[in-house]
Regions:
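Ligand-binding pockets and gating/stacking loops
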Residues: 1-245
């Protein structure tokens, strides 16, 4: 079982990374800068396990900062700990998406708008590709050893999950949706970016494409400045106030 979030002697640094990774997991994460990260399953993903099968997407993870999950970010702790609050499993952090266009395409596919006919055509194309992939993978499985066969089984499980999502989306394809054009990319200002991401988040819930979501307004140790309100210095440095509260 995952260990509760009790501080350990000698690990006083890395507080920012530990804060984000503990927020929805409630565990004390493993101190590492490498790929051997370990936290715990987050609350949103526990909920997604229960209600996510009924929607096209089990969950949606959004952010406003760029959110890498590789490398070191905070005093010996991996960037995965600082840059996401959603963990599918103790070793699988879910990257938070900060590009409105990518979020739109995840919700509605590579269409220009939420138009029902365009969505259905895209779904049928996706299904055709998955049918081909599944057939090829099943044929390959018969020639593999036990270890490789196990890995391929995990891959096929993921493919079947995508197939389930497509089937759910096809059943919902004729549903009326608010008119929403595909975003071009990340807006120039923080205010515009935040509003667009909130609009997409709301749209995902309104259309029942998902019922579970997380939104990380700023990653830990963010250097974002806010010139719109007269703050030209980075948030993290300003928050310390020269260590003089």
């Amino acid at each position: 079982a995952d260990k509760p979030a009790i501080p350990r002697q000698g690990e006083g640094v890395g507080d920012h990374a530990r804060a984000a990774s503990t927020w929805l997991t409630g565990v004390h994460v493993k101190k590492t800068e490498g790929p051997d990260i370990r936290a715990g399953q987050s609350l949103d993903q526990l909920i997604a396990q229960q209600v996510g099968q009924a929607t096209q997407l089990a969950s949606l993870e959004l952010a406003l900062d760029s959110v890498e999950v590789l490398g070191a970010c905070d005093q010996g702790y991996s960037c995965a700990y600082a840059n996401t609050i959603s963990w599918r499993t103790p070793t699988t952090p879910l990257p938070m998406e900060n590009d409105p266009r990518a979020v739109f395409e995840r919700l509605f596919g590579a269409a220009d708008s939420t138009d029902a006919a365009a969505r259905l055509a895209r779904l049928r194309e996706d299904r055709s590709v998955l049918d081909f992939v599944s057939a090829e993978a099943n044929g390959l499985k018969r020639s593999l050893g036990a270890a490789d066969s196990s890995k391929l089984t995990q891959y096929l499980d993921a493919v079947r999950d995508v197939e389930r999502r497509i089937q759910t989306a096809e059943r919902q394809a004729d549903r009326e949706m608010p008119v929403f054009e595909q975003p071009i990319g990340i807006p120039d200002t923080f205010e515009q970016h935040a509003k667009l991401m909130y609009d997409l988040w709301l749209l995902a819930f309104q259309t029942d494409l998902t019922r579970v979501g997380t939104f990380m307004m700023g990653k830990e140790v963010t250097g974002r400045s806010y010139p719109e309100i007269g703050v030209s210095s980075g948030h993290h440095g300003v928050s310390h106030h020269q260590n003089d509260p």
